[in-house]
Amino acid sequence: MNIKQAKQEIINTVQAYLTKDETGEYAIPVERQRPVFLIGPPGIGKTAIMEQVAQECGINLVSYTITHHTRQSAIGLPFISKKTYDGEDVSVTEYTMSEIIASIYDQIEQSGIHEGILFLDEINCVSETLAPTMLQFLQYKTFGNHRVPDGFVIVTAGNPPEYNKSVRDFDIVTYDRVKRIYIEEDFSVWKEYAYKAQIHGAILSYLEIKKNNFYSVVSDLDGKRFVTARGWEDLSQVMKVYEQLGFAIDYDFVVQYLQDEEIARDFAAYYELYNKYKNIYRIPEILEGSIPENSMTIKNAPFDEKLSLLGLLLDSLGQEFISYYRKKAAQEDFFEQLGFLRSDLKEGLGSGKEILERQISSYDTMITHRKKAGMIDREQEKAMCAALQALNDCLMALAVEGTGDAKGDFLCVKKLFDEREQIRQKEISDAGRHLTHAFEFLARVFGEGQEMVIFLSELSAGYYSLKFVSECGNDAYYKYNKLLLLKERTQELKDEAMELLGL
């Protein structure tokens, strides 16, 4: 299955394992809760989906790469204790608590949540000395004398032997005690994730043209040459910062992440072309409603160039959709905090300044706590930090304009909220107008051809673009989407009629 299907299967497994019956016991007994074993090529996102699953399920995640551990750190250190057997005092060997088990209890203490996932990566690459310990763990869910706490689902991962020489194959007895899931790379599925992860537009456009270069592992006389999903994502992150700093993005830089010289050279050449198209077609002008004269030449351009133009439009619009998503989340958090402020002011729990100071301290602590416990992703953290900054702005405003009475202080703060909302609504209007102009440009240049179909499909697949359209609406999107759906249905009816007539 692909990584998206694997993620859903893990969510289903977690929910099933953590379901309780009418007596409060787990519906599936702990001894029947098989550890999940994900097996697939390196760098396709096995670790990343575990973070997503934990956040979506609202549970803990404790992650370890097991190859980084020795037998002692996995099962604990030995110590001598005194026992009495049949009236005779004897010395016996016991073990301290495993570092891994201890970290689970630490995480429970930090988050206050007693259920979670224990994720162990590279499980089938352990050393010979640690192998018996891992087999015992998979079979009995124990490290040494200590058991994984009930409520923690065990998920493990590993690579097939063709990708890693250190792989140790499990025997049938072990495989019969795990829930094994094979994962394969799939660009179309990764692309959905890529939109949400804000992968660089040049990478998405390039891979749309050269899908076979998304994931590649080749062995030759010089060793292994490879490109992985992880490589593309890491490259994207650094590219954005390099662009901000004005650093060169060329073959010598790209090959550090895409460790296949041919693919690295090809992408570096495409990136140069991508920037050339950006200058030629003047995307900001198109989104403002003007159609540059040279834009009409693309009608007869190679299809690769058309895809690059669509990518540039989608990337530029995507930045506005991401901004909408972030500011909406921040404004909602800000609004919630103002509700608490209003309530406390009504109850006379202090002046506006005093209450805000307490709120800011409490909210800041909550952000730190949730971040440390791994309960929020990066976008949620950014939204909460933006709301925190808004609260600090309110505190500064009260210091200057505060009246000291409840009504006056709240009106002062509400004024700041209203100003932020007014700016946000203008940005929403601008983004909607830019999207409409993009549709008008494509309709004028390409009509309702395959370019329009691709543009609509990518908008519908994008997490932030779909959020924007579904929450804010856009007449042009609905118009062209409806037309294309009607054309598809008409073609389907024609095909069915031809089939019935035997033609």
What residues fall within each predicted segment?
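AAA+ P-loop NTPase catalytic core and its hallmark functional loops
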Residues: 1-212, 220
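Conformational switch/transducer regions in large eukaryotic molecular machines and scaffolds
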Residues: 35-37, 57-67, 80, 89-116, ...
